């Protein structure tokens, strides 16, 4: 037995451990123990290295599984959008300020999409976490306006007193505006040839039916 060799292997194991080269560090310890099976410091070092290596491996495997699930879900959603003919696009650098995502109920084969209802007259909005593709615009508005919003104390905003629009986008990127009726299903909007589901988030614009100067000015921005 060469005591110097054991000490050198021990020092190497500690150095490799510090560099997070765990298999190599284990190898050094095991070689040292071949020369000195009862060396307790080497045994302790080997146990520490193996424990840390196992902990890191569990973290790595868990991360890989999470990333795999994310990839699988992304492919599933992309397939569902393509199957329905829904145009989608992503804005470079866009980071949503909400945690909600498009979901697919595989059993029912139904999509739900996080959706903003915007009220430009009051600079307010509502985020619907999961708007089901089979629900109508009217059904969603009835739920939203069941009670008066704080910004609408007179409860002027109700399904029958408002008009709902969605923005259109042609192949040239020109933005337009299209009115949508209360009985129209969300899926009908999503599959419209000029509708683009951008950044995994749907948007509807809700304004009063009443013709006011504000409304005329607002429509004029869209060339209406």
Residue ranges and their predicted role:
Residues 1-63:
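Alpha-helical protein-protein interaction scaffolds
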Residues 12, 24, 96, 121, ...:
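Intrinsically disordered, low-complexity regions enriched in small/polar residues
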Residues 49-83, 87-89:
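Alpha-helical linker/edge segments of TPR/alpha-solenoid repeat scaffolds
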Residues 57, 128-130, 219:
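Surface-exposed beta-strand edges and their flanking turn/coil or helix-capping segments
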Residues 78-192:
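Non-catalytic interaction/regulatory modules that flank or connect domains
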Residues 169-224:
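C-terminal interaction modules of eukaryotic adaptor/scaffold proteins
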């Amino acid at each position: 037995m060469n005591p110097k060799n054991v000490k050198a292997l021990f020092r190497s194991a500690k150095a490799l451990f510090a560099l997070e080269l765990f298999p190599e560090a284990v190898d050094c310890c095991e070689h040292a123990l071949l020369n000195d099976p009862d060396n307790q410091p080497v045994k302790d070092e080997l146990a520490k290295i193996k424990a840390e290596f196992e902990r890191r491996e569990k973290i790595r495997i868990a991360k890989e599984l999470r990333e795999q699930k994310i990839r699988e879900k992304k492919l599933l959603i992309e397939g569902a959008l393509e199957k329905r003919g829904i145009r989608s696009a992503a804005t470079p650098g866009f980071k949503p300020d909400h945690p909600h995502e498009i979901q697919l109920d595989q059993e029912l084969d139904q999509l739900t999409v996080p959706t903003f209802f915007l009220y430009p007259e009051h600079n307010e909005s509502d985020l619907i976490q999961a708007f089901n593709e089979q629900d109508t615009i009217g059904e969603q508005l009835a739920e939203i306006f069941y009670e008066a919003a704080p910004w609408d104390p007179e409860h002027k905003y109700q399904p029958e007193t408002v008009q709902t629009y969605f923005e259109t986008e042609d192949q040239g990127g020109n933005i337009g505006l299209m009115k949508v009726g209360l009985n129209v299903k969300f899926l009908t909007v999503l599959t419209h040839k000029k509708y683009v589901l951008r950044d995994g988030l749907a948007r509807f614009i809700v304004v009063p039916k009443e013709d006011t100067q504000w409304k005329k000015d607002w429509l004029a921005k869209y060339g209406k």
